[in-house]
A protein has these predicted regions:
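Residue(s) in the substrate-gating loop at a strand-loop-helix junction
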Residues: 127
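C-terminal helical subdomain
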Residues: 167, 175, 191-231, 238-240
Length: 245
């Protein structure tokens, strides 16, 4: 069991989906959770635009002002855009890479002195798309691959001070982001949503079901527990057999 009572964590994208599940689970474990999102909902305590330097600084500063320390950082906030490379809007590329890669870097940078002091943990929510690729998702996949590279660097730099850095890489998770993709694919293919889920979304999964947000939260808690001390610089892939193909 993870002994997380009284520790302080910053969780981004906490208004819904994986971020909300992680924030609520860590609060149930006794942690002080600073939930960050662009909109205030559920466990969100700090509203911030994480595509900006100022927003990321605000998130870290709010945690330090409220609790005086940061023990855990969970960068999770995400967004998706699907388009062929030739048609991919440059502003959407900038938005996705800012949120999915630059924000995790800035959160690590600003929180690093506190993580070093506490021997803390950095657990990024990445994706199976950090280890495999699919067409039409160039920004998302580039950012998630880059995030795994960042985790490796943080692990090496943090090791002398007892700081670990890992990433959770789930397959498709039952979140609003994925549910919107199902609806969009149903319209595009002229199929009902159940068929899209099985024949399109879950086609790469060996196990034909969506990962639940609570299962990702379970993985985060495991990484923050005693067994997680041996995990650093490497992803925990929970992709229902996708990357085994």
């Amino acid at each position: 069991m993870a002994d997380l009572e009284g520790k302080v964590t910053v969780v981004t994208g906490a208004a819904s989906g994986i971020g909300r599940a992680v924030a609520e689970r860590l609060a149930a474990e006794g942690m002080h959770v600073v939930g960050v999102d662009i909109r205030s909902d559920g466990p969100v305590t700090v509203e911030a635009d994480l595509t900006t330097r100022e927003g990321n600084k605000r998130a870290v500063d709010a945690a330090l002002e409220a609790h005086g320390r940061i023990d855990v950082v969970v960068p999770n906030a995400g967004v998706q855009h699907v388009s062929p490379v030739a048609d991919f809007p440059e502003d959407r590329w900038d938005q996705l890479t800012s949120l999915l890669l630059t924000s995790p870097f800035l959160l690590a940078k600003y929180a690093w002195p506190s993580l070093v002091e506490s021997g803390g943990r950095y657990v990024a929510i990445a994706s199976v798309h950090g280890v495999v690729a699919s067409p039409f998702k160039s920004a998302y996949i580039s950012a998630k691959h880059g995030l795994l590279g960042l985790v490796k660097v943080l692990a090496l730099e943090g090791a002398p001070d007892g700081v670990t850095a890992t990433a959770v890489c789930p397959g498709y998770v039952r979140t609003p982001l994925v549910e919107n993709q199902i609806a969009d694919q149903a319209k595009a293919h002229g199929m009902d949503e159940d068929r899209v889920l099985e024949d399109v979304i879950l086609a790469p999964h060996a196990v034909k079901r969506l990962v639940e947000p609570a299962e990702v939260a379970d993985a985060v808690v495991w990484l923050l527990g005693p067994a997680g001390r041996t995990m650093t610089g490497t992803p925990l892939v929970m992709d229902q057999g996708w990357s085994a193909r």
